[in-house]
């Protein structure tokens, strides 16, 4: 406890001297009750100090506070405002959250084109669920022109990260030659990667089409 108090005091001094990271860290201290009495209103205030001065992590934290109603009244519109600021600065989770907001119409009008644009940015940074979302967008032509080759590409990116549903989808693309050059051997390898993880849909597909499950 003494060490935590010393750390919090150090952050406070640095924050008062204008250190943005320390301001954000003070917010974390108050949010978690680390070295100080837990106070979510104070946490929000420290996050906001740093966010208004441009700290990317604080921008995300302010957005989270508004989204959750944590230390401040819940406000989806203001949450999106701060997610977008952090997203423009390159924060991947903020890009994802902004996409989700546009997709669901939280704090803004529903806009699947903007949702796709932000998921794409996150996908390009390696965010797995965003890669799947972008693949689905291209497959369904939702918010973007339908493009089987891009759908296959993004599902394969997600599959390479170990997602069994994406692995099965990638296998199906290769088995059927949809969006890629047909390669049944490669396709079956992908499907077996999914079955090895217990993905039931892939197992059933193998049974239905006369292939071994493993």
Residue spans for each PLM region:
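Terminal, low-structured helical/coil segments at or just beyond the last alpha-helical repeat
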Residues: 2, 193-214
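Short helix-capping/linker turns of helical repeat alpha-solenoids
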Residues: 16-19, 32-34, 39, 52-56, ...
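Hydrophobic face of amphipathic alpha-helices that form TPR/SEL1-like repeat modules
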Residues: 25-32, 36, 61-68, 97-104, ...
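TPR/TPR-like (Sel1-like) alpha-helical repeat modules
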Residues: 153, 181-200
């Amino acid at each position: 406890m003494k060490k935590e108090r010393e750390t919090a005091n150090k952050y406070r001094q640095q924050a008062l001297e204008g250190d943005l990271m320390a301001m954000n860290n003070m917010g974390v201290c108050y949010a978690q009750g680390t070295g100080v009495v837990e106070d979510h209103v104070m946490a929000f205030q420290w996050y906001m100090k740093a966010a208004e001065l441009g700290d990317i992590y604080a921008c995300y934290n302010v957005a989270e506070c508004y989204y959750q109603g944590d230390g401040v009244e819940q406000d989806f519109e203001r949450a999106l405002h701060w997610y977008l600021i952090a997203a423009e600065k390159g924060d991947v989770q903020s890009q994802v959250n902004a996409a989700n907001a546009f997709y669901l119409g939280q704090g803004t009008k529903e806009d699947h084109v903007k949702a796709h644009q932000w998921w794409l940015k996150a996908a390009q940074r390696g965010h797995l669920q965003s890669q799947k979302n972008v693949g689905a967008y291209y497959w369904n032509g939702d918010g973007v022109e339908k493009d089987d080759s891009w759908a296959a590409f993004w599902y394969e990116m997600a599959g390479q990260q170990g997602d069994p549903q994406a692995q099965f989808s990638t296998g199906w693309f290769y088995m059927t030659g949809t969006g890629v050059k047909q390669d049944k051997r490669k396709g079956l390898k992908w499907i077996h990667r999914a079955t090895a993880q217990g993905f039931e849909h892939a197992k059933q597909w193998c049974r239905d089409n006369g292939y071994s499950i493993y």
